[in-house]
Amino acid sequence: LLRFPGGTVIKTFHWKDGIGPKEQRKAKKNLIWGGINPYHFGTCEFIEYCRELNCEPVLVINISTGTPDEAANWVEYCNGTENTYYANLRRSHGYPEPFNVKYWALGNEEAAEPDAGRHQNPHKYVEDVWHFIKLMKLTDPSIKLIANGESGNKEWTKTALKGLDGAIDYISYHAYVGTNGPSPYSIFQKIQGQDTWMREFAEMVKATVPDTVQNWKKWYRFPHRTAPVKIALDEWGIWEQQEPPYGTTNTYEWRHGLATACFLNAILHNAEHIGMANWAQMVNILAPIMTNSQTSV
């Protein structure tokens, strides 16, 4: 699986800015991480890249500054098969067949106050997200949805789970580890802690929502989930606080490679409950791949 356009950046991302001829796309300031986003890598480029890697795409919806209509139109653009505006728009861009994007995430870290999120109140998140879910699911009932979870706030997550049960298939969990103090080995203790925390998070999910849906309003014109809610570990990685202002430029050393292997082992240890896992980030932010206009390393 590969996740696009990423995490916090989704707060100001609008998918229509990244379709059509590249020379006609409008460059915009990246309000989250700085710099300029020319939108040259948009939906179609991402799908092509996923096909090249032979992986499933995961698209993240902007529920902060976006709208339910915008989200549903993105689903139609990607998966539409009928003679409709956005399906035809995709065809006009050179893609006659649908992309069949299966996984869609309902925002990212929406309770994070420093970011552009506005859902510190989980009840507000549930209320707002339902409008997105309905239009998206009515556009394509087959899609699988990932709701926000707050790995450090179980009560927030419980409220989201209870409020969205039946409609969602995954609950997200984000986990980063780094060195704590002078000892370079402290990172491994943190991974051990994440192993335990993932198990406890999974137990909380199972205790909050039953494996099978118990109550589903018949007037919903789309099906409820048919499997237990699983964890989407859609951000995990190594985060060493370094360069200001965001501390998001990592210099990886041997211990980070070993730590990554240990983290993967912890994920496998909890594989019964984890339905997907995505390394974060991939390019330029906390990334193993760094680029500029001339090269990449």
Task: Name each model feature, range by range.
Residues 8-43, 48, 83-115, 178-181:
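Aromatic- and acidic-residue-enriched carbohydrate-binding clefts of CAZyme catalytic domains
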Residues 80-100, 207-224:
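Short mixed-charge
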Residues 2-24, 44, 62-78:
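Aromatic-lined carbohydrate-binding surfaces of glycoside hydrolases
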Residues 226-297:
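Aromatic/acidic polysaccharide-binding cleft in carbohydrate-active enzymes
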Residues 28-32, 36-39, 45-48, 127, ...:
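Glycoside hydrolase catalytic-domain groove-lining segments
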Residues 2, 50, 74, 104, ...:
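Conserved, mostly hydrophobic/aromatic
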Residues 25-40, 56-65, 106-126, 139-151, ...:
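The substrate-binding groove and active-site-proximal loops of carbohydrate-active enzymes
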Residues 96-116, 148-149, 157-195, 229, ...:
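Aromatic- and acid-rich polysaccharide-binding/catalytic face
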